[in-house]
Amino acid sequence: MTSGYPDYVLGNEAFDAELYANPFRQWTTQELLDQISSRPLLYDPGTNWNYAHTNYLLLGLALEKAAGQDMPTLLQRKVLSPLGLTATANSDT
């Protein structure tokens, strides 16, 4: 991905410490965004590439805004139900 956003998981020692202290914690979207809010971009957007969970979080927020539904509802309505996936669960974190 070429956004330049840092990953809130990879290379984030504070996140790692909290994750290992409570591996079953359910993180809120805001808590995940807070993990990167004070960190600078890794590079100018479009000039390089890196994997970042952050990009998927932001994509989910954009989809929720555009659809007017939360992500679990949107996934159920647009993906899981049409495919007949009845034993698939959503993980927010």
What are these regions, as identified by a protein language model?
Residues 1-13, 38-40, 61, 65-93:
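Active-site helix/loop module of the DD-peptidase/beta-lactamase fold
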Residues 1-52:
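Active-site-proximal loop and beta-strand segments within enzyme catalytic domains
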Residues 55-60:
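Well-ordered alpha-helical segments within folded domains of soluble proteins
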